[in-house]
Amino acid sequence: MESELLAFEHVTCSADSVSLNAVSFRLNRGENLVIFGPESSGVDLISPLIAGIIHFSGGDIYYKGRPIKNFTFSEELAYRKDLGYLQKDYGLINNMTVEQNISLPLQYHSQLSGEGIRDVVDGFVRELNLEHCRDFRPVRLLRSEALKTAYARAIALDPDLLLFEHFLEGQCLINAQTVLRSIERRFVSGNKSVIFVTYEPERFVSFADRFLMLDHGAIVFMGTRDDFLRADNEFLAQYMRSSTEGPMTIL
């Protein structure tokens, strides 16, 4: 039987003129979901809501069957360890090196010794080809190097749920292949779950089990990879054509 990991139940939220209106969806353990839509659609509220950065005004968000708003302090700490969040601006600490940024969650949320933390960081540095810049601070990094550093930090605690937010947009796709290969190897199969929030859903066809599209705070398409590729939905068809003609209102 499928095990539900995350659920939105009629979630309503407004922030900076963008809103979600009674949005509901579920994510099972081991399932990968792409959430997309135009600007002002509400897609950019999803990850901050899950991460607890912003708060919803109606409905509930459940993690492993428990409403996150009712978490005790210890449950909230466990939830944060279970959650890996790669933000669209990468969120690197400016006065820390690549190595220090990657090690940060391990220092605060693991029982590893200093040597154990170094071993984990060394593994990420080798896997992601960061040896040449491990002592650089973010200001010296190429955009692809910043992405790889933020990605390593997001997955350092081996979380059950990963949020990848617009992480490829503005990237050189050749240089980003190292991260994409790592995602495929680590998360496409198994019991980890990934939510990709993006304006470019076609990039994630090989990774995703399901696709969900928002427009003006409401779900207008939800389906499997095959449903997405057929594009029978009028909102989806307009979006994939980048057309001004269709049911969506263009800003």
Predicted regions and their residues:
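Helix-to-loop junction immediately C-terminal to a conserved catalytic motif
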Residues: 51
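Conserved ABC transporter NBD signature motif
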Residues: 59-69, 79
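Q-loop/switch helix immediately C-terminal to the Walker
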Residues: 96-107
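Conserved ABC ATPase "signature" region
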Residues: 115-133
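Conserved ABC ATPase signature
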Residues: 137-145
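Conserved ABC ATPase "signature" C-loop
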Residues: 216-217
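C-terminal boundary and immediately downstream tail of ABC-type ATPase nucleotide-binding domains
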Residues: 226-251
